[in-house]
UniProtKB/Swiss-Prot annotation:
It comes from Escherichia coli O157:H7 (strain EC4115 / EHEC). The keyword ATP-binding applies. Keywords: ATP-binding, Kinase, Nucleotide-binding, Transferase. This is Thiamine kinase. InterPro entries: Aminoglycoside_PTrfase, Kinase-like_dom_sf, Thiamine_kinase.
Amino acid sequence: MPFRSNNPITRDELLSRFFPQFHPVTTFNSGLSGGSFLIEHQGQRFVVRQPHDPDAPQSAFLHQYRALSQLPACIAPKPHLYLRDWMVVDYLPGEVKTYLPDTNELAGLLYYLHQQPRFGWRITLLPLLELYWQQSDPARRTVGWLRMLKRLRKAREPRPLRLSPLHMDVHAGNLVHSASGLKLIDWEYAGDGDIALELAAVWVENTEQHRQLVNDYATRAKIYPAQLWRQVRRWFPWLLMLKAGWFEYRWRQTGDQQFIRLADDTWRQLLIKQ
C-alpha cells in the first residue's frame, strides 16, 4: 500500500496512524540494520524500515518498495506500507548466520531471482563511481583514484551476458535461513543488470568459494562455467571501485573510522588486481 505524502512523519505518528495496535519489540534486533525496528501484535510481526542513506534520492527508496511489491514471498519480504522515509514489510522468521550457505543452495536462490520479471530500472555503476568521487573528502582524492575512474569511463561497462533483476548486496547478513528455504532482505540496491555483476558482487570468503558459486550457477543456467567466470572477472574492477568509493563517501558522511579502514583495504585490493 503506497501512501503519498510530502510531509515527513515521526515514528510515533506512523504507528498511531497506521498500526495503532502494534508495539515495538525493543529487545529484538536479529537481521535488522540501519534505522529498522520490529513491531508486533498478537504474534504478527512487521519490520519498519528507513533509508540507510539519508542523502540518497527518494526514488531509491521507492525502487526498493516496488521491487519488493513484485517479488515472490518465497525469496523476499512483502511490503505493506510505503510513504516518505518509511516502509513497513513482513518480518522473515529464521536465522541470519555469519557465513554464506552452501554454494549450490545460494546459486539456486540467485538463479530463481534472476528468472523473475525485470524491475524496470537499470543498475549503472559509472554515475555512482562519479558521485562517490565528487562527494568524498577532497583530502582523500588521489591521482590514482582519478586515473582508475577515467580508465573505467573510457572502457565502459561490460556488455551484459544476461539481463535480469538483481539484489546487488548478497552477503551472509542479508540471507535469512528460514524453514521454507533461503530468503534475501535489504533490497535497497536492487535493479536490473548483468547476472555476472550479481555473482561478482557476492561477499565471498575466498576465490575458491567464488569459483564454486559461479560453477554451480552456470550448471543451473546452462552456461559454460569458464565463460561465466570470465564475465564475472570483467566486473571486478568496477565493483572494487564501487566499494572503495562507497566507503570513502560513507567516511565523509559519518566520520566513522571503520570506513577509512575498509576503503584503504579495498584500494590495496585494486592495486593487486591491476
